[in-house]
A protein has these predicted regions:
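C-terminal structural cap/anchor segments
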Residues: 338-341
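Entry/capping segment at the start of metal-dependent catalytic domains
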Residues: 12-55
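Acidic two-metal-ion nuclease catalytic site recognized across multiple nuclease folds
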Residues: 204-335
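Metal-dependent phosphoesterase signature
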Residues: 77-94
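Short, flexible loop/turn elements at secondary-structure junctions
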Residues: 30, 64, 149, 282-285
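Metal-dependent phosphoesterase core characteristic of DEDDh/y 3'-5' exonuclease domains
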Residues: 37-43, 47-80, 100-211
Length: 341
């Protein structure tokens, strides 16, 4: 049954309790897409242990702030009746409850595309209500993951775990389509508690291949992610040093490119040393690069440790997914880079 979270203090120390090492699957419904000015209307979460056995559920309804006008597109999507906008907790009370949930020691917060949308929305909500916006990412052994990039990897390399829906002849990885195709939905899509329940069921499907699940968890740990990237083979040597090569996996690249592109490391960001920079190598226009046209002919990707995209080693079983045409472009670009140092 649903329950509103009972407020309790969160220790600054490393102490763990019965909730330690748990997943907190969550979803939000909002008034729009603007993280600075829109607000959360619904928050729902299901906490599980590390074997995905449910521990408890939480639901929070948030009253509309007087300075917020909901986006018509958001209202059509989440289908929350306008008459309900005046119900629920004020934003501060709701943010405080959610903050305590996500900061429970040992909590791994995750959802479907949460690192692409929900997590940043949560940070803005916490900051606006004078709550620390980042502690759920690192403090008290807390961390975060995202099921969307995990779904992409399973689609590429463990396809048998799901039925993969096609809409108008194209693969769709939208949660509602995955839920319908695999009979995971019980209720109205885009209602927070329904979506988070689907997310948990989806995770349980993936967890049947537990070795894969545990391996992918490592890509959301900064140290593990950094170690794996340090093990990538050298693809190019230059006066600047060795440049590792790999395959960057992200939803940004879409099903037409199997969600992955060949890349080579080109160093770290100067203003943000914790970010690595990667050059995409499957675009033919790269060989047209001049000092004046760099912005038009190159695609540089910023990669934060422990966050998507996922960089896979260039093993044959992964590399074959880019196809012969893109592999040929990659080889030509690599030779061009070597010749034009």
């Amino acid at each position: 049954s649903l329950q509103i979270y009972n407020l309790q203090s969160v220790s600054d120390g490393p102490k763990r309790d019965a909730m330690a090492d748990s997943y907190l699957f969550y979803d939000i419904e909002t008034t729009g897409l603007n993280k600075a000015f829109d607000q959360i209307l619904q928050f729902a979460a299901i906490r599980t242990d590390r074997q995905l056995n449910e521990i408890d559920r939480h639901a929070v309804t948030v009253k509309l702030r007087p300075d917020v006008i909901p986006s018509p597109a958001a209202v059509l999507t989440n289908r929350i009746p306008v008459t309900e906008f005046s119900n629920g907790l004020c934003e501060y009370e709701a943010a405080e409850q959610i903050h305590r949930l996500m900061n429970q020691p040992g909590t791994i917060s995750l959802g479907y595309n949460t690192m692409g949308f929900d997590d940043e929305f949560m940070r803005f909500s916490f900051h606006r209500n004078l709550l620390p916006p980042y502690t759920h990412q690192y403090k008290n052994s807390c961390s975060r993951m995202d099921l969307y990039p995990i779904t992409i990897i399973y689609r590429l390399y463990k396809k048998d775990v799901l039925i993969w829906p096609e809409i108008d002849g194209k693969l769709s990885l939208k949660l509602e389509h995955l839920g319908s195709a695999n009979r995971l939905i019980s209720g109205q899509s885009h209602e927070a508690i329904v979506d988070v329940a689907v997310t948990v069921k989806l995770a349980r499907r993936f967890f049947k291949k537990e070795k894969m699940w545990r391996y992918l968890e490592g890509y959301f740990d900064k140290e593990t992610d950094a170690h794996r990237m340090a093990q990538l083979p050298v693809g190019l040597q230059s006066a600047a040093g060795d440049h590792c090569s790999g395959l960057m996996v992200s939803g940004e690249y879409g099903p037409g490119q199997n969600y992955q592109i060949p890349v080579i490391s080109i160093g770290s960001s100067l203003p943000y040393p914790n970010q690595t920079l990667w050059l995409r190598l499957d675009l033919p226009q790269l060989r047209e690069t001049t000092p004046e046209a760099t912005a038009e002919t190159t695609w540089v990707i910023r990669k934060r440790m422990g966050e998507p995209g996922i960089v896979l080693p260039p093993h044959d079983r992964y590399w074959q997914k880019i196809g012969k045409d893109r592999n040929a472009i990659f080889q030509e670009n690599l030779e061009w880079l070597q010749a034009n140092q």
